Amino acid sequence: MLLRIKEWFYYKTSEVAEGYNTFIDVTEYSRVDGVLTADKNGYIEVIVREVLNETEKAIQVILDSGSVVGNVKCWKTWIPKSVIAK
């Protein structure tokens, strides 16, 4: 499943994940000439492995990570619905 989230939220989540040597994967759609780039509305597309839980205000997901370097890891996080593209 693919999910488009706000660029600032992606970077905030990535910063925490990188502290655990985990790098969140994005789709090729979010890369321009190999550089991570948000679309014109400020969204980055991430790869969701599994949706664990959903509340009125947020969803808990497992995001893919590590496919670029061949190390399959995942990152579990809550994503507020306010940062998800409609």
State the predicted function of each range.
Residues 2-86:
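Feature detects long, helix-prone N-terminal segments enriched in hydrophobes
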